[in-house]
Amino acid sequence: MNNHFKCIGIVGHPRHPTALTTHEMLYRWLCTKGYEVIVEQQIAHELQLKNVKTGTLAEIGQQADLAVVVGGDGNMLGAARTLARYDIKVIGINRGNLGFLTDLDPDNAQQQLADVLEGHYISEKRFLLEAQVCQQDCQKRISTAINEVVLHPGKVAHMIEFEVYIDEIFAFSQRSDGLIISTPTGSTAYSLSAGGPILTPSLDAITLVPMFPHTLSARPLVINSSSTIRLRFSHRRNDLEISCDSQIALPIQEGEDVLIRRCDYHLNLIHPKDYSYFNTLSTKLGWSKKLF
């Protein structure tokens, strides 16, 4: 064992037996290396582990130096929204489909993780968004997002009329199916599918991407991440929602606005030493290979 990490948390909700096997392999391997290991409670229950230290995501965030998330990007997003509140590094083993946020190859995870545990890694901070549903600036509901905050109809698809204010200055009004407000991390997710730009993770920027706008002049907009975005609605309806990372939904009631701003805390994401953002883009998006 080394001095870089002493206590390691294992998190991620497995959706199939193969992923659960990775959790068990990781737990037993870390124990043989002499690390203190905290296993998320649900995982320990499903593995039927005996005499193991377990904890919630918050407890892992408070006690561990490193959290290893086993799963796909959805697992990473769900865990990271909580873990980002604490001084803990996070890395992922990809057991999902695309895996933009989960770098480690499950077939070679032990060797890659061994190098990381020896201190051979790249660290970066990814900012989150905070979404508030408020009435007369009185906060009523709040959540955070690592990828994006999305304005959309609750149940039945229909056009929404709304106004967008940036730092309390009117920017534009829009008739569309919704609006995607994305971080650089989320620029390769839902925002990309809607025609938004790809932002490198280190950019202090937020993108606003319209969803099926009812005008050809509506285009994605990139603003400084220090800006505050306010959404106001022309026709008060009770079926609008704000969703965070497609995992948490906040209903919007009549007379309420939505405020979106950068969070005060960051996700401390780490990667193997040979990590390259542009290589990841090329691999995941199927870009053409180098010509010469």
Swiss-Prot record:
A single cellular component GO annotation: cytoplasm
Q: Which GO terms describe its biological process?
A: NAD metabolic process; NADP biosynthetic process
What the record says about family reads: Belongs to the NAD kinase family.
- Report what the protein is called: NAD kinase
List, alphabetically, the Pfam families matched.
Answer: NAD_kinase, NAD_kinase_C
InterPro entries (UniProt xref): ATP-NAD_kinase_N (IPR017438), ATP-NAD_kinase_PpnK-typ_C (IPR017437), NAD/diacylglycerol_kinase_sf (IPR016064), NADK (IPR002504)
Compartments it resides in: Cytoplasm
Which residues does NAD(+) bind?
D73, G74, N147, E148, H158, R175, D177, T188, A189, Y190, S191, L192, S193, Q247
Instruction: Identify the keywords attached in UniProt to this record, alphabetized.
Output: ATP-binding, Cytoplasm, Kinase, NAD, NADP, Nucleotide-binding, Transferase
| Broad class of enzyme this protein falls into | transferase
Q: What is its EC number?
A: 2.7.1.23
Please name the source species.
Answer: Escherichia coli O1:K1 / APEC
Catalysed transformations (reactions): NAD(+) + ATP = ADP + NADP(+) + H(+)
The UniProt function text for this chain reads: Involved in the regulation of the intracellular balance of NAD and NADP, and is a key enzyme in the biosynthesis of NADP. Catalyzes specifically the phosphorylation on 2'-hydroxyl of the adenosine moiety of NAD to yield NADP.
**Which GO MF terms are attached to this record?**
ATP binding; metal ion binding; NAD binding; NAD+ kinase activity
Major localization listed first in the record, in broad terms: cytoplasm
Q: Which cofactor does it need?
A: a divalent metal cation
| Active site, UniProt feature | D73 (proton acceptor)
